[in-house]
Amino acid sequence: SHVQAVASKAGIIRTEKAFEGIIYKGVGKDYNFTNLEEYLVDGKIPNLKSELNTEVLISEYLAKRLHLKVGDKFLTFFMKENGKLPNKRNFLITGIFNSGFQEFDATYVIGDIRHVQLINKWNSTDVGAFEVFVDDFSKKKKKGDDVYKEIPPTYNSITIEEKFYSIFEW
């Protein structure tokens, strides 16, 4: 098993030619990119081991819609509450992936969790969720139940099948 911290933030990527709504998935130094590496179609995995940087993975689907490629920079706007001016972040594409799951590919950009922490004014220990990976996929339900029993009642635990029901329903 492997546990990794993540935090997500909705945003809008704007280029000279297009714009797309996205979810920026912030991941930490402990993130296991092994599963994503097999879906890499160009470039490389971002280096999140050192200080905060702007390197991200973007899907082939989003890259095509936004006319972007590895090495390109793009601007992302993250909305603030109360109608204040949005936070802006420039990101650098180091890799392009194609997972084959349209729901995922049309939505997610993956980069440094510290951007989400800064935008949300969180501490460096604050995260949005923990992802728990199991060695045996057939035991995911039991692991999900075990986690649920151990967390405070104000938290929730769901399996990947529950989160992405439409992918697994077939």
Annotate each PLM feature.
Residues 7-50, 93, 110-113:
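The feature marks short, hydrophobic/small-residue-biased sequence motifs that occur predominantly
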Residues 33-34, 60-107:
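Mid-to-C-terminal secondary-structure elements
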Residues 5, 11, 26, 65-73:
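Nucleotide-cofactor and metal-assisted catalytic machinery
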Residues 1-3:
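Extracytoplasmic/periplasmic
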